[in-house]
């Protein structure tokens, strides 16, 4: 789960990390009031969306007076911001973050991720801040330095100092960086994070470190024990179909194809998408209905899949383990009748009572194409999507 920059900076402040003073604003009036409460004569207004690349897309602006901040608010609030990390529709801008301007001498990068290979939280730093870190890793990997955190000790000051030396920091800056490093390592574990990023971490002209930006991604599997973070979730930034699926305990990810997929089991779902691609088709989604493929869940899954107007056919691929295929077949028939599916539906059943399940589908009178194998199902779905 992503947090907005202003939310991330609230958490940064809880951990005594250096952030500028700012206000989240939902109207032009609030933005105008914000600059009156902030110090300085230059401020920064930022669109709050769950995507990077805001600056290049025009979503970040230096403002010098009330007229400029009002104009920026009127331009963006209620609109959608398109960046290189969004789709063509962009993300809705419902909030601006207005903060004090900063005098910047250097821009650095500081981030942390959970590295599954080493089973450690790994920090990364670079002297190339303020740019896409993926480009730095690809083009100049020697400028990216890493530090793994021992889960027994947490982040240690000496590790922070070592990274500070590699960044070319001097004097009191080293002490400041070590503090930031230790507190971020603590935050990462205590808040159940999946990613933590400051890009850029700046050295001001006064020689101090400042977290100019802040990005937090929370591990969604841990939200049950992070109620305060859960309350920060912004549904407007999520695909509405994905949000609806989550409310029904369905795992759904929207894609850009035209063959809807309904599968039980994440591994089988990925395999189904692969075989659709292998036979020349394009999956419209990833959807795992889980172990209990009941009529109700199948019906909701159909509704979510068919809410995508690009879907021209649906492939249902169910492996009956504990759940019997004959019961699944009855659930599919009931769901198709209830939802009113108007595109071809290809169903492949395998496992417990699969022959009986296929017989029930064949005798149902419902417009369902029964497939005997996964390959057959994929071929049939691709043909159906092409109108053949």
From Swiss-Prot:
ATP binds at residues 46, 53-55, 99, 102, 107. It is an enzyme of class 6 (ligase). Keywords: ATP-binding, Ligase, Magnesium, Metal-binding, Nucleotide-binding, Tricarboxylic acid cycle. Substrate binds at residues 264, 321-323. SUPFAM superfamilies: Glutathione synthetase ATP-binding domain-like, Succinyl-CoA synthetase domains. Pathway: Carbohydrate metabolism; tricarboxylic acid cycle; succinate from succinyl-CoA (ligase route): step 1/1. Residues 9-244 form the ATP-grasp domain. Its EC number is 6.2.1.5. Mg(2+) binds at residues 199, 213. The keyword Metal-binding applies. GO terms for biological process: succinyl-CoA metabolic process; tricarboxylic acid cycle. GO terms for cellular component: cytosol; succinate-CoA ligase complex. It catalyses: succinate + ATP + CoA = succinyl-CoA + ADP + phosphate; GTP + succinate + CoA = succinyl-CoA + GDP + phosphate. Its cofactor is Mg(2+). Gene3D superfamilies: ATP-grasp fold, A domain, ATP-grasp fold, B domain, Succinyl-CoA synthetase domains. It holds the Pfam family Ligase_CoA. GO terms for molecular function: ATP binding; magnesium ion binding; succinate-CoA ligase (ADP-forming) activity; succinate-CoA ligase (GDP-forming) activity. Heterotetramer of two alpha and two beta subunits. Succinyl-CoA synthetase functions in the citric acid cycle (TCA), coupling the hydrolysis of succinyl-CoA to the synthesis of either ATP or GTP and thus represents the only step of substrate-level phosphorylation in the TCA. The beta subunit provides nucleotide specificity of the enzyme and binds the substrate succinate, while the binding sites for coenzyme A and phosphate are found in the alpha subunit. Belongs to the succinate/malate CoA ligase beta subunit family. This is Succinate--CoA ligase [ADP-forming] subunit beta. It comes from Pasteurella multocida (strain Pm70). The lineage of its organism: Bacteria, Pseudomonadati, Pseudomonadota, Gammaproteobacteria, Pasteurellales.
């Amino acid at each position: 789960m992503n947090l907005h920059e202003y939310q991330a900076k609230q958490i940064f402040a809880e951990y005594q990390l250096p952030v500028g003073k700012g206000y989240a604003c939902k109207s032009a009036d609030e933005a105008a009031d914000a600059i009156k409460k902030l110090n300085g004569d230059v401020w920064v207004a930022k669109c709050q969306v769950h995507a990077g690349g805001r600056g290049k897309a025009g979503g970040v602006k230096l403002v010098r007076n009330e007229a400029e901040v009002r104009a920026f608010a009127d331009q963006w609030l209620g609109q959608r911001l398109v960046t290189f990390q969004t789709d063509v529709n962009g993300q809705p801008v419902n909030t601006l973050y207005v903060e004090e301007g900063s005098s910047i001498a250097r821009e650095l990068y500081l981030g942390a991720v959970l590295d599954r290979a080493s089973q450690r939280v790994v920090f990364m730093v670079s002297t190339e801040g303020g740019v896409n870190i993926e480009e730095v890793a690809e083009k100049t990997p020697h400028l990216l330095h890493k530090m793994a955190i021992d889960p027994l000790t947490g982040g240690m000051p000496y590790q922070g100092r070592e990274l500070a030396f590699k960044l070319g920091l001097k004097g009191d800056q080293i002490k400041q960086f070590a503090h930031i490093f230790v507190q971020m390592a603590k935050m990462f574990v205590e808040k159940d994070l999946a990613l933590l990023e400051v890009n850029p971490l700046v050295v001001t002209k006064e020689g101090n470190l400042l977290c100019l930006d802040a990005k937090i991604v929370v591990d969604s599997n841990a939200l049950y024990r992070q109620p305060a973070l859960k309350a920060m979730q912004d549904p407007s930034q999520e695909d509405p179909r994905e949000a609806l699926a989550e409310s029904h305990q369905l795992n759904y990810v929207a894609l850009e194809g035209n063959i809807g997929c309904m599968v039980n089991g994440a591994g089988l779902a990925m395999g189904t998408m692969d075989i659709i691609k292998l036979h020349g088709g394009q999956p419209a989604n990833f959807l795992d209905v889980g172990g209990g493929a009941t009529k109700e869940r199948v019906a909701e899954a159909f509704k979510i899949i068919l809410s995508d107007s690009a879907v021209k056919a649906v492939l249902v691929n169910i492996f009956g383990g504990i759940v019997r295929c004959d019961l699944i077949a009855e659930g599919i028939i009931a769901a198709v009748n209830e939802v009113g599916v108007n595109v071809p539906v290809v169903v492949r059943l395998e496992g417990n009572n699969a022959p009986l399940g296929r017989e029930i589908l064949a005798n149902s009178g419902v417009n369902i194409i029964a497939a005997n194998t996964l390959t057959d199902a994929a071929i049939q779905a691709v043909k159906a999507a092409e109108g053949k």
